[in-house]
Amino acid sequence: MERVGGFAQKKPTPVKRGGASYDATQQFCKNEIERYVEMYRQLKVEDQTARLIRDMIDVLLRRYHGYSIKENIGAHYYETGLPHGTKTEFEHVIPASVARDLLLFDRLTVDEALNIPTCRLSATKHRKLNSTKLGSTTPDIYWFWKRYQELGITVTTHDGVAVDTATWNLDSHYSYFKNEIHSN
């Protein structure tokens, strides 16, 4: 293993976060997810390869959500009435694994899966949500606020618009955030 002797790891050039880096992340993740979806569809049997492909799609979705949503607008939605300085946690309103499965079975496009609803919840409400059966599932994907309604959680959009969770559905989400969804 002499070939590793004298190796000096080069630090990557820092990338300035902003529009160009968010767009690059979106395009990279979209291309890779499309590639993995095609690989998945070519499989003849649900085996370890299928599991690894699903895992890779999960990683790419979460990477995009963390970088291009969480680091950009914080989340699509915010729990209403949080006092300034309240510790919040980033939450997938529709669990990421559900979005992945919807994508694999042609119920969502890649752009839609990349932009599933996300929310900043207080740590207290997030723990409460996770302590129920609703932590990693949802009773209704289209009416995705049902799991929040059961806990009395109200929300606004990231730019302060009040959301009526009884009428705001997945179509409302994608219509409101259409400028966040790129279709390159």
Model-assigned labels for residue ranges:
Residues E89, C119-A123, T157:
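A structural signal for short, well-ordered beta-strand segments and their strand-loop junctions
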Residues G66, A96-R100, T124-K128:
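Amphipathic alpha-helical interaction surfaces
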